[in-house]
């Protein structure tokens, strides 16, 4: 099982802060693609190129491998000012 967390605008758009996935996924990108198919809000919130991912609390590329028991967090890039 994968624990998937959503933060900031990503969470606001989909209205969910966390879900668990039973399916096997090879990469964080495969998880993103799967979730983006859940509907328009999900696709917008998880748009590739406008999203960062952390696996087990470490910032990683979307192409990184994931395994059963991992925590995957999706969030928009942080901006400052």
UniProtKB/Swiss-Prot annotation:
SUPFAM superfamilies: MoaD/ThiS
Modified residues (1-thioglycine): 81
Gene3D superfamilies the record matches: 3.10.20.30
Keyword rRNA processing: no
GO MF terms, alphabetically ordered: nucleotide binding
A biological process from GO: Mo-molybdopterin cofactor biosynthetic process
Pfam families assigned: ThiS (PF02597)
Signal peptide positions on this chain: none
Keywords from the UniProt entry: Molybdenum cofactor biosynthesis, Nucleotide-binding, Phosphoprotein
Tagged with keyword Lyase: no
Residues bearing the modification Glycyl adenylate: 81
The protein's assembly and partners: Heterotetramer of 2 MoaD subunits and 2 MoaE subunits. Forms a stable heterotetrameric complex of 2 MoaD and 2 MoeB during adenylation of MoaD by MoeB. During catalysis MoaD shuttles between the two heterotetrameric complexes.
NCBIfam families: moaD (TIGR01682), PRK11130.1 (NF008347)
Family: Belongs to the MoaD family.
PANTHER family on file: MOLYBDOPTERIN SYNTHASE SULFUR CARRIER SUBUNIT
Name by which UniProt lists this protein: Molybdopterin synthase sulfur carrier subunit
Species name: Haemophilus influenzae (strain ATCC 51907 / DSM 11121 / KW20 / Rd)
Gene: moaD
